[in-house]
């Protein structure tokens, strides 16, 4: 989950808060000599509405006296259903303010629930919607966040939330952008056109700004025309810095040569389609990395005139690069090194990591309101690595592990599944399994009267092509996968996929396992083309064949994957509500 940059956003919230001072209720004018601790003790002896009103008064005094964390705790524990209309309005405004300032987005979302239940003055309603939109962005729900922020802008015309709106829109895929369309709303339409324009420009900055000029002519009164998002204006500085030459370091022999061949095919096919489509296609030079002599490979890359390097692929080679202070050329390695984090200057790391999927499963389960998880992973090195990734992320979020079961991949799933759901009964199951084993798990859950237990898996249970008869037993199981593998669930159909021409060419003739690696090659080429943008604008996103890609602070490329849920044996769309219903 990516947290919003708080600079301009905080300023926007502050401005609206100050503008709303005229409607601040009388609780902020109460006598300053009231003792909040005595009020809380008094509330403990009271019941119902009287206790809720006393706690609200105490929380207000705590907040104004600088004891904001305690004030937030009091408001979170308060039964707001016991408050009268005006007091409940005051509770919502104060809780949302404290939740925003104290880093508790769930509290903000709870406060904003009053918008569905009571009529508020416009200024107050817009303030709550703004805070709710920002909170949902922090909770990893860019679709609803963008919807609310654009609603606020449509009502107020504010331009100082443009960066917040752009931050959320740039995280959305084609299907999600379509879901935001509001015919007749010029602000929403303009934002969606701008987002698609940037997404379709690739790494060609000149092409982007030529199209941007056309957009500005067509949208003269749009808030983003008057004040372009900061990330877009910063791209102006990259004009004339496009990548013209890329060196690719892949092994031509050895155990990774088959993987390298698939990645190379993806790179070459996409480069040809970019050129054929009139884009700025960088020249490619391929060098055999089988011998692992990294210094020699960099010398060859520099001699070829390369501006960016793709590779190496071998994990040990990437780990060796991580031991250096700097690499000679900006480098997109095709694996992750073994260091806890990458600190090498100019080194970026990208791959299709099962550990990443496990972390996303943990975050999604938490966002969906689950707090106790069981794990069912294979008893091998792969299961240990991926299982640890889920366990660590789940624990960091505050979740409990009810049971962790390591199973024999060659055995029946019956006993291991039974043990995974035995006492204490979890409220979700994390499953790491290949298709044959995974298909046994839901029927076993049904046998043990646990068919309603949510199951979150990784993409490894899906073979990559719809097989309704074989996969019907997986109905209800949720899993993330690359957009190119689940086009209907990811973007509403193959035609809306990123790099559709390349997708058509590669999908027609290749097995699913090879197809994933080719998709990785496509995104590697696109990331290399955009290297100046990645370096200049940390956190900028790309809608790719393998997910929504962005570079973390340590140069590792983070993939946010779309989710699918088996329905009648085929992957179907599924959306997280992002709000949950459990206590933090």
What are these model-predicted stretches?
Residues 504-573:
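Segments of small-molecule ligand-sensing domains
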Residues 426, 442-520:
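Extracellular/periplasmic periplasmic-binding protein-like sensory domains
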Residues 339-363, 471-483:
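Short beta-strand elements at the ligand-binding edges of bilobed clamshell
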Residues 17-20:
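C-terminal motif of bacterial Sec signal peptides marking the signal peptidase cleavage site
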Residues 347-406:
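An alpha-beta-alpha
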Residues 22-25:
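Bacterial signal peptide processing site
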Residues 33-232:
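Alpha-helical protein-protein interaction scaffolds
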Residues 258-265, 277-339:
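Beta-alpha junction/loop-to-helix N-cap segments that form part of ligand/metal-binding clefts
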């Amino acid at each position: 989950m990516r947290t919003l940059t708080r600079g301009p956003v905080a300023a926007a919230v502050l401005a609206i808060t100050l503008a709303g001072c005229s409607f601040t209720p009388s609780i902020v004018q109460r006598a300053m000599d009231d003792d909040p601790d005595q009020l809380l003790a008094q509330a403990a002896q009271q019941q119902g509405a009287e206790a809720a009103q006393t706690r609200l008064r105490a929380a207000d005094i705590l907040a104004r006296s600088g004891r904001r964390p305690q004030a937030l705790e009091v408001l979170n524990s308060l039964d707001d259903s016991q408050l009268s209309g005006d007091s409940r309005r005051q509770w919502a405004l104060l809780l949302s303010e404290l939740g925003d300032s104290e880093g508790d987005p769930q509290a903000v979302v709870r406060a904003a629930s009053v918008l569905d239940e009571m009529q508020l003055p416009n200024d107050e309603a817009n303030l709550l919607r703004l805070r709710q939109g920002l909170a949902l962005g922090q909770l990893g729900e860019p679709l609803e966040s963008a919807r609310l922020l654009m609603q606020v802008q449509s009502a107020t015309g504010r331009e100082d939330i443009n960066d917040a709106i752009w931050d959320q829109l740039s995280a959305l895929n084609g299907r999600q952008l379509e879901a935001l369309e509001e015919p007749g709303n010029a602000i929403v339409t303009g934002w969606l056109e701008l987002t698609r324009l940037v997404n379709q420009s690739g790494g060609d900055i000149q092409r982007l700004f030529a199209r941007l000029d056309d957009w500005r002519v067509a949208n003269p009164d749009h808030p983003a025309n008057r004040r372009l998002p900061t990330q877009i204006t910063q791209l102006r500085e990259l004009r004339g810095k496009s990548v013209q030459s890329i060196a690719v370091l892949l092994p031509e022999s050895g155990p990774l040569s088959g993987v390298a061949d698939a990645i190379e095919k993806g790179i070459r096919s996409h480069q040809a389609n970019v050129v054929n489509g009139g884009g700025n296609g960088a020249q490619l030079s391929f060098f055999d990395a089988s011998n692992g002599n990294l210094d020699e490979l960099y010398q060859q890359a520099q001699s070829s005139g390369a501006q960016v390097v793709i590779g190496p692929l071998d994990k040990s080679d990437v780990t060796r690069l991580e031991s250096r202070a700097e690499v000679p050329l900006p480098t997109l390695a095709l694996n992750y090194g073994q260091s806890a984090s990458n600190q090498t200057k100019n080194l970026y790391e990208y791959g299709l990591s099962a550990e990443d999927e496990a972390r996303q499963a943990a975050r999604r389960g938490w966002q969906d309101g689950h707090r106790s998880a069981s794990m069912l992973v294979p008893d091998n090195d792969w299961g240990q690595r991926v299982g640890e990734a889920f366990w660590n992320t789940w624990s960091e979020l505050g979740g409990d592990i009810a049971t962790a079961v390591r199973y024999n991949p060659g055995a029946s799933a019956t006993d291991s599944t039974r043990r995974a759901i035995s006492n204490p009964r979890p409220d979700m199951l994390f499953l790491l399994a290949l298709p044959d084993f995974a298909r046994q798990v839901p029927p076993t859950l049904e046998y043990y009267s646990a068919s309603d237990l949510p199951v979150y898996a990784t993409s490894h249970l899906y073979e990559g092509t719809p097989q309704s008869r074989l996969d019907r037993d997986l109905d209800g199981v949720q899993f993330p996968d690359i957009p190119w593998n689940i086009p209907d669930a990811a973007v509403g159909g193959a035609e809306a996929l990123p790099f559709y021409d390349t997708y058509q060419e590669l999908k027609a003739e290749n097995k699913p396992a090879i197809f994933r690696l080719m998709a990785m090659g496509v995104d590697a080429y696109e990331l290399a083309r955009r290297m100046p943008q990645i370096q200049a604008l940390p956190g900028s996103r790309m809608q790719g064949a393998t997910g929504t890609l962005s570079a973390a602070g340590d140069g590792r490329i983070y993939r946010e994957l779309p989710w699918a849920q088996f329905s009648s044996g085929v992957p179907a769309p599924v959306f997280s509500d992002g709000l949950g219903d459990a206590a933090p």
